Structures are given as structure tokens and as C-alpha cells.
């Protein structure tokens, strides 16, 4: 069954392209990817990302459980704030990249990828059942994916919009810090976060979903529709644009961010054609707290000892051409890797991408060739982001 977000009907009416993504029928663009992309880089855009997964972990053992099933140290951030962390399998491969918020009172909210929440649901509950065989565990795991609406407001003008709507300056929050706010009586969680490289915030709140898989929980999304329309109306003076998943992908790629399923992944059951990727290969070791035990740690330590089979690197095209997932990467005629993400940068007007290559080439400044339509095209490896961070991005010079 194709999944749909709360205000799918609004998107269906206003978006020029709607199609399935990770099992969800989602808006890809409303006007054009380029127009929406540049609106976020230069002004402000709003994304409906209610297809993202959410879990609530409650109980005295919630923290200990999360410390074991994720890689980072989530014990330090105070309520209410989040930690970027990873869920790994026993082989050290990335099951998903997640954000875990400490909500206080032994309660945590995890935000995960849209195509990972079902397998994570099964994974977490299987681990819990395994623990219960040896004793009691004070832990409740609740999957809130279909109940939670999530909107992402991104761009340099997002700060002005947050001040107007909620009376807060998001620059007073550290990255992933959150506050409980209200909009016209609708209570929600607001976090300084995003997936575009720009400054911005995201809001979470529960509402009825007319497409909920449980018929008893279906209803009209009055809150979600009101919040969406209110933000659009308030943002008109700032040139706000509704933005689809197409622009979200080009924005994250310009920022150099990984995408689950492309840069981070694990082998699926009975599959032999999907390479597994560990956080060491994907330059995500900043999200690993080594002074604790977690699933996959032993495998990562062994990989560190024997060396990496490949490593992630960013590159930009020198010759004309747009790199795409699966294209081969060469160095002096030798096959050294493969592209995992690529696009034509709407901001820079050149081809950019991410590839996994032999580790010795995964440094900036290496001249490589990308095979595009059967022909080698010159490219060079670079350090992310692709744009000038003094002119664009969350920490641009004002």
C-alpha cells in the first residue's frame, strides 16, 4: 500500500509532480526544482517531510537501550535537545541515520528516514524482546510515524519567519536544540535543524491522518493544514515557496550531506547486490562515541584494523556533464569507484556528486574521470560544501 502524508490532498492539488518515493506518494516539485532550490538558498522554503519516521521511547531503561542501539552519546544533551546518531547492524553497516531528542522525564523521540522506520520498528522490538528473556525492562517503544506531522522551514529568511510566528530567535538555539511552542493554540516541538545546509527550523506535532493505515485513526488533518497554510501566508513577504523532494535532494547534495540508501546502506534480506557501508567509510565517525558499547562496535574496530575497502569523497565536474548514481569513477584509466549521488547544481550550474573510491583517492584535490554516457569526463575531488560557506549556508557572513 502506498503511504501518504497528512495533507497529501493539498500537495496533489498544488504540485506539478507527485510520485512515489520510498513507498510514500510525495510532491517532487511545485514550480521547478531550480526555482524551489534557489528560494531556499536565497530566501525561504517550506517542505512537508511528514514521511519521516518518528519513535517515542519511554521508561527508566529508555536511555540505556538507546545508548546500546545507537552510536553516539545521547546521555549528555539536556532536555530539550537532539543528537545526531546512527543505528548499525552487527556488521557495522548503517541501518539508518537518526536524530534522537531528549524530551525529559525518561522520554526520547527518534526521527529516522522514511524508508527505514518499518525495519527499525522490527529491529528495536526484536532487541527489546531479547532483553526481556533475561529480565524485566522498563521501556515502551511507540511508532508515531503516521501520527506525526513534520514541516521543515529552511533558508536565510527562516529566522525572520520564526520570530514572527513563534517569537523566538532560532539563532539563540544551538543546532538540534528544541523548544515547545504554540501556533494558534496548536502545540508543537520546534527544533533548529534541517537537511539543506541553510539555517532553519522544523516543527513536529500530532494530527489526524486521512491516510492512516489504521482506519480507526483516520480523520481530517485540520491542524496540519492550518499550520501549513499559516506558514505560507506569513512567509509571503519573504518570498516563501513550497518545496518538494527534488529540491531537498539537490540542496542536501550541495551541502555535502549523505542520503540513506545512497551513501549509507546495509544489505537487505536475501539481497546480494547492495554493498554495505559503515560510518567509517561514509566519514560519519564524528557520530561515534567509542567509550560505550553499542551494536556494531566490534565490527568497526576490526575494520579500522584491516583498513577500509572504500571511502566517500565529494567531487565537482571540470568537463561538462552531470554525474548520476552508478556511474563509474576512474583515475588514470583505472577503475577506482562509483558515484552514489550526483546532480547539476542549481546554484553553481555545474555537475557535482558523491562517490565511494579507493581510500587513497578520498582526499580533496585529486583529478579523476567520471564515465558519463560511455565517455570519461574530467572531475576533481573537493571538500564539502560545494558552495562558498561565506556566501551561502547556515553560517554565512551577514
From Swiss-Prot:
E.C. designation(s): 2.1.2.10
SUPFAM superfamilies: Aminomethyltransferase beta-barrel domain, Folate-binding domain
GO MF: aminomethyltransferase activity; transaminase activity
Gene3D superfamilies noted in UniProt: Aminomethyltransferase beta-barrel domains, Aminomethyltransferase fragment, Probable tRNA modification gtpase trme, domain 1
Subunit comment: The glycine cleavage system is composed of four proteins: P, T, L and H.
InterPro entries registered for this protein in UniProt: GCS_T, GCS_T_bac, GCST_C, GCV_T_N, GcvT/YgfZ/DmdA, GcvT/YgfZ_C, TrmE/GcvT_dom1
Assigned protein family: Belongs to the GcvT family.
Protein name in the entry: Probable aminomethyltransferase
Keyword Acyltransferase: no
